Amino acid sequence: MVNQSSPMGFLLLGFSEHPALERTLFVVVFTSYLLTLVGNTLIILLSVLYPRLHSPMYFFLSDLSFLDLCFTTSCVPQMLVNLWGPKKTISFLGCSVQLFIFLSLGTTECILLTVMAFDRYVAVCQPLHYATIIHPRLCWQLASVAWVMSLVQSIVQTPSTLHLPFCPHQQIDDFLCEVPSLIRLSCGDTSYNEIQLAVSSVIFVVVPLSLILASYGATAQAVLRINSATAWRKAFGTCSSHLTVVTLFYSSVIAVYLQPKNPYAQGRGKFFGLFYAVGTPSLNPLVYTLRNKEIKRALRRLLGKERDSRESWRAA
């Protein structure tokens, strides 16, 4: 069946019934996007320039920052255009590209956050063997697996979603082209797509989240066996930032991809979708830097607020 909507594209409704809210959201989204660009670029730059950040933890953090930059850039420019003006259309090709990239990068983040939880588990529970277990080659392998698996997932799910028989009104009740909103737009049988969405949600959302919780459960047990307040504070400082990011990201993803079928849940899902597409990438740099002394020190050096010689910089 030929997709009748492909010549004209789609109409992204967003919150078009509330023009005043759209103006406010434009300012919020634009500000968040700027914070995302500046914050994540700084983390990548510091991870490259500062030798003490040449470790697995910051390798994965810089990978997450690069991912967040791509993640937001794939959808925010189109979102800003739709929020600012009366034109809220997106071409079929544009929707296809956005869906493919957004789905791939979102899946990558789910897997990468799991890898980072494993890294923190080894750092806390196996500190003496950390360098042996989490070596540079393994870091590259784990990061590559995350990107390749997400690419395969997007290659499988994107075509089947775009080949649905869409309703003639072509109105997507969302800010961007996502699998759940496109399934709701279909006027045909969506049983296969709903099963596919459920299976992929279990594999790439439920399973990674379960592994993250299991790793932190094991980490908590190991920390409780240590009768040292200093060790507790160090373990908390090591894991709290990542656990905060996991909570923000996964709570939003679950609200979008595992929501019940009712109008209230779908309306609420738009807010959560907006948050995990725009909010979490802008908050991630803040969360990771607020309690991280190494990144703070590197940032002060980059800004010239610490007058260290070139030799002390290299020695660090």
From Swiss-Prot:
UniProt keyword annotations, A-Z: Cell membrane, Disulfide bond, G-protein coupled receptor, Glycoprotein, Membrane, Olfaction, Receptor, Sensory transduction, Transducer, Transmembrane, Transmembrane helix
A GO cellular component entry from the record: plasma membrane
Entry's transmembrane regions: 24-47, 56-77, 99-118, 138-156, 194-217, 235-257, 271-290
GO MF terms held by the record: G protein-coupled receptor activity; olfactory receptor activity
Topological domains, Cytoplasmic: 48-55, 119-137, 218-234, 291-316
Pfam families cross-referenced by the UniProt entry: 7tm_4
Domain of life per record: Eukaryota
Membrane topology (UniProt): Multi-pass membrane protein
Sugar attachment sites: N3
Disulfide bonds: C95-C187
Compartment annotation: Cell membrane
Main location, first listed in the record: membrane
InterPro entries recorded: GPCR_Rhodpsn (IPR000276), GPCR_Rhodpsn_7TM (IPR017452), Olfact_rcpt (IPR000725)
Extracellular side: 1-23, 78-98, 157-193, 258-270
GO biological process: one example: detection of chemical stimulus involved in sensory perception of smell
Entry's family note: Belongs to the G-protein coupled receptor 1 family.
Function: Odorant receptor.
PANTHER family: OLFACTORY RECEPTOR
Protein's name in the database: Olfactory receptor 2H1
Protein's gene: OR2H1
